[in-house]
Amino acid sequence: MSASVAARWVVLDIEGTLTPTSQVHVVLYDYARPRLGPWIHDHPEDPVVRKAVEDVKSEAGLPAEATAEQVVAVLHGWMDADRKAAPLKTLQGLIWQDGYARGELTTDYFADVVPALRAWRQRGLVLAVFSSGSVAGQVASFSHTTSGDLRGLFAQHFDTVNAGPKRERGSYEAIAAALGAARPLQIVFLSDVPAELDAAAQAGWHTVGLARPGEPYADADFGSHPAVGAFDDIDIEVVS
């Protein structure tokens, strides 16, 4: 499997595309889960935490006077269901940011990822990230990796708060506007989730699916999207 596209911007998913799913669902989720309650308890005056808690109550239909324990129970339920709720992602991102800063977390990537990203960047492609994880969490994850600090590789970061849901066309249109792309076809989106690729294609983007061996979407039907098993199989012609 191989794919050839012409683009100026490369927008990347993280889970299942840059990192193994286990990096998120085992390492990061297991790190955040027991820390959600203590984080809320220890940061009562943090406006970001307060808003996240209020949003949890609103989305879950909890009363305003609901306890922190009730809020945490909802958050744990969302984690169990793998629901990409914005307030959950905000709180997880804060916890992960702290974990990376403490040196307790390190991001590991598929072997083909970092060499490809560096090569694309050196050739003049502009790299950006679109993930359901918060921007704060994204930036932190690139700061402490098995390949060093990779933050300098990426020009912009997008999440479900500043762009929108990953399976909706409008989110990709918003990203294209933020990137300043004169034409949507100047952008290629790399993801392992067919529904996300569908939304990007509806917005006029190029798309490439990642069918990585052993990952949840390895045997998915990517339809009209070209699919590859690794970044080594993608040829991107740089356009202005």
UniProtKB/Swiss-Prot annotation:
InterPro entries: Enolase-ppase_E1, HAD-like_sf, HAD_sf. GO terms for biological process: L-methionine salvage from methylthioadenosine. Keywords: Amino-acid biosynthesis, Hydrolase, Magnesium, Metal-binding, Methionine biosynthesis. PANTHER family: ENOLASE-PHOSPHATASE E1 (PTHR20371:SF1). This is Enolase-phosphatase E1. One of its GO terms (molecular function) is 2-hydroxy-3-keto-5-methylthiopentenyl-1-phosphate phosphatase activity. Monomer. Belongs to the HAD-like hydrolase superfamily. MasA/MtnC family. It comes from the Bacteria. Its EC number is 3.1.3.77. Pathway: Amino-acid biosynthesis; L-methionine biosynthesis via salvage pathway; L-methionine from S-methyl-5-thio-alpha-D-ribose 1-phosphate: step 3/6; Amino-acid biosynthesis; L-methionine biosynthesis via salvage pathway; L-methionine from S-methyl-5-thio-alpha-D-ribose 1-phosphate: step 4/6. Binds 1 Mg(2+) ion per subunit. Bifunctional enzyme that catalyzes the enolization of 2,3-diketo-5-methylthiopentyl-1-phosphate (DK-MTP-1-P) into the intermediate 2-hydroxy-3-keto-5-methylthiopentenyl-1-phosphate (HK-MTPenyl-1-P), which is then dephosphorylated to form the acireductone 1,2-dihydroxy-3-keto-5-methylthiopentene (DHK-MTPene).
